[in-house]
Amino acid sequence: MSQNLFNVEDYRKLRQKRLPKMVYDYLEGGAEDEYGVKHNRDVFQQWRFKPKRLVDVSRRSLQAEVLGKRQSMPLLIGPTGLNGALWPKGDLALARAATKAGIPFVLSTASNMSIEDLARQCDGDLWFQLYVIHREIAQGMVLKALHTGYTTLVLTTDVAVNGYRERDLHNRFKIPMSYSAKVVLDGCLHPRWSLDFVRHGMPQLANFVSSQTSSLEMQAALMSRQMDASFNWEALRWLRDLWPHKLLVKGLLSAEDADRCIAEGADGVILSNHGGRQLDCAISPMEVLAQSVAKTGKPVLIDSGFRRGSDIVKALALGAEAVLLGRATLYGLAARGETGVDEVLTLLKADIDRTLAQIGCPDITSLSPDYLQNEGVTNTAPVDHLIGKGTHA
């Protein structure tokens, strides 16, 4: 472990030093006033631990089944786009780190490495995330994932339109990046990132590359045109018929939607508010977790805001089958590449293990709401307190 890197926040600070402001803000920022990203962190304080004493915790197990497969711990590295802007071949670095840790990696539709290239270079448990895009393009991607060995398909449902991210607007961030004097100066102030950028070139939206979309600008335009705001329950049934393996629906924030997805053939759901990047002031998925678990009776996974092992333990105690990591592992990637991701996963694993010992639960599969007390109150500190201080989801 690197000196003075003791938690996820330390990696965020190191990442901030390495990245140009517009790249940092793109991945750190949220929608509009960013109340949602703040709430994603504050919400964990609603639950306090109720430890059980005089329990033998000399031996502890973090192993658990996720969708019927035994894993080293109930975590995944979730889907995030443009990882190549953080570190060269960022998708591959994340996937390899996940494989070494014994957990799945979810490749994004907006990845900088194609579905088939990642499958050729990584032999881990690969999942593929699909946006609500028009069926012709969606079918091609799904069949590529099927034929190259991806085990699970994740449909993201909360991006019918893009979130209004004002940091990006202020920075004039777009794909491809424009080379204004401000951007060039920012790059000069971050030479390590700029040198990587010069050596490896502009990352491509690899799943949208074709003979007609040779430039990144054309790929971004194609992806934008393919977003399908009419995608509905009938389209979900079409996707269910197309994909023969495990199917999860992501982006849900109600127990009723979760139950409907199961009724339509999904094998499970992922509660998510997209890390606060889509709808500002949306509820946290933690606030509907227990109800969704009770209503569906099927695997319920969750993301948005997880930074500590104690956050993860709280979600598991409320019934989540697993937690997906987003910014947490991206901080490690941006700071130190694949090594940084390895280190963040090691930190979180140790944090989970320590929390289990402290609450008197030697086996992670034995977690239950009995270990928690709901305080029902969140931190009401003003949003200005967190801007630029790394408390975003």
Swiss-Prot record:
<feature type="binding site">
    <location>
        <position position="165"/>
    </location>
    <ligand>
        <name>(S)-mandelate</name>
    </ligand>
</feature>
<keyword id="KW-0472">Membrane</keyword>
<dbReference type="Pfam" id="PF01070">
    <property type="entry name" value="FMN_dh"/>
</dbReference>
<feature type="binding site">
    <location>
        <position position="131"/>
    </location>
    <ligand>
        <name>(S)-mandelate</name>
    </ligand>
</feature>
<keyword id="KW-0463">Mandelate pathway</keyword>
<feature type="binding site">
    <location>
        <position position="274"/>
    </location>
    <ligand>
        <name>(S)-mandelate</name>
    </ligand>
</feature>
<keyword id="KW-0285">Flavoprotein</keyword>
<dbReference type="InterPro" id="IPR013785">
    <property type="entry name" value="Aldolase_TIM"/>
</dbReference>
<dbReference type="GO" id="GO:0033720">
    <property type="term" value="F:(S)-mandelate dehydrogenase activity"/>
</dbReference>
<comment type="function">
    <text>Catalyzes the dehydrogenation of (S)-mandelate to phenylglyoxylate (benzoylformate). Is likely involved in the utilization of mandelate as a sole source of carbon and energy for growth. Active in vitro with the artificial electron acceptors 2,6-dichlorophenolindophenol (DCPIP) or ferricyanide, but in vivo most likely transfer the electron pair from the reduced flavin to a component of the electron transport chain in the membrane, possibly a quinone. Shows very low activity with oxygen as the electron acceptor, and also with 3-indolelactate and medium chain 2-hydroxyacids as substrates.</text>
</comment>
<keyword id="KW-0288">FMN</keyword>
<keyword id="KW-1003">Cell membrane</keyword>
<feature type="binding site">
    <location>
        <begin position="79"/>
        <end position="81"/>
    </location>
    <ligand>
        <name>FMN</name>
    </ligand>
</feature>
<feature type="binding site">
    <location>
        <begin position="326"/>
        <end position="327"/>
    </location>
    <ligand>
        <name>FMN</name>
    </ligand>
</feature>
<dbReference type="InterPro" id="IPR037396">
    <property type="entry name" value="FMN_HAD"/>
</dbReference>
<dbReference type="InterPro" id="IPR000262">
    <property type="entry name" value="FMN-dep_DH"/>
</dbReference>
<keyword id="KW-0560">Oxidoreductase</keyword>
<feature type="domain" description="FMN hydroxy acid dehydrogenase">
    <location>
        <begin position="1"/>
        <end position="377"/>
    </location>
</feature>
<dbReference type="GO" id="GO:0004459">
    <property type="term" value="F:L-lactate dehydrogenase activity"/>
</dbReference>
<dbReference type="GO" id="GO:0019596">
    <property type="term" value="P:mandelate catabolic process"/>
</dbReference>
<dbReference type="GO" id="GO:0005886">
    <property type="term" value="C:plasma membrane"/>
</dbReference>
<comment type="subunit">
    <text>Homotetramer.</text>
</comment>
<feature type="binding site">
    <location>
        <position position="277"/>
    </location>
    <ligand>
        <name>(S)-mandelate</name>
    </ligand>
</feature>
<feature type="binding site">
    <location>
        <position position="26"/>
    </location>
    <ligand>
        <name>(S)-mandelate</name>
    </ligand>
</feature>
<comment type="similarity">
    <text>Belongs to the FMN-dependent alpha-hydroxy acid dehydrogenase family.</text>
</comment>
<dbReference type="GO" id="GO:0009060">
    <property type="term" value="P:aerobic respiration"/>
</dbReference>
<comment type="pathway">
    <text>Aromatic compound metabolism; (R)-mandelate degradation; benzoate from (R)-mandelate: step 2/4.</text>
</comment>
<feature type="active site" description="Proton acceptor">
    <location>
        <position position="274"/>
    </location>
</feature>
<dbReference type="InterPro" id="IPR008259">
    <property type="entry name" value="FMN_hydac_DH_AS"/>
</dbReference>
<dbReference type="GO" id="GO:0010181">
    <property type="term" value="F:FMN binding"/>
</dbReference>
<protein>
    <recommendedName>
        <fullName>(S)-mandelate dehydrogenase</fullName>
        <ecNumber>1.1.99.31</ecNumber>
    </recommendedName>
</protein>
<feature type="binding site">
    <location>
        <position position="129"/>
    </location>
    <ligand>
        <name>FMN</name>
    </ligand>
</feature>
<feature type="binding site">
    <location>
        <position position="108"/>
    </location>
    <ligand>
        <name>FMN</name>
    </ligand>
</feature>
<dbReference type="InterPro" id="IPR012133">
    <property type="entry name" value="Alpha-hydoxy_acid_DH_FMN"/>
</dbReference>
<feature type="binding site">
    <location>
        <begin position="303"/>
        <end position="307"/>
    </location>
    <ligand>
        <name>FMN</name>
    </ligand>
</feature>
<keyword id="KW-0058">Aromatic hydrocarbons catabolism</keyword>
<feature type="binding site">
    <location>
        <position position="156"/>
    </location>
    <ligand>
        <name>FMN</name>
    </ligand>
</feature>
<feature type="binding site">
    <location>
        <position position="250"/>
    </location>
    <ligand>
        <name>FMN</name>
    </ligand>
</feature>
<keyword id="KW-0997">Cell inner membrane</keyword>
